[in-house]
UniProtKB/Swiss-Prot annotation:
The name this protein goes by in its record: SPbeta prophage-derived uncharacterized protein YorZ
Length: 70
């Protein structure tokens, strides 16, 4: 089954990785390719550790109507 990366919208030929951005009450999941997962995971750790989910998504430019759960 072919999967599409939620971030870069490219087909995923290898592993599909779930990237979760969360805070105490809410979270959002992305099914993404290895390169997006690595890049965004590092950015979240280094730049967004004290931000809410909404502010993290805005900072990363991923605030395109993703369903925030919590």
């Amino acid at each position: 089954m072919n999967h599409i990366c939620d971030i870069c919208k490219e087909y995923i030929s290898g592993k599909t990785i779930c990237l979760r951005i969360s805070d105490e009450k809410t979270y959002v999941d992305f099914n993404c390719c290895e390169s997006c997962a690595k890049g965004y995971s590092d950015k979240v750790k280094n730049e967004c550790s004290n931000l809410s989910v909404k502010k993290t998504l805005e900072h990363l430019g991923l605030n395109i109507k993703y369903k925030i759960r919590g």
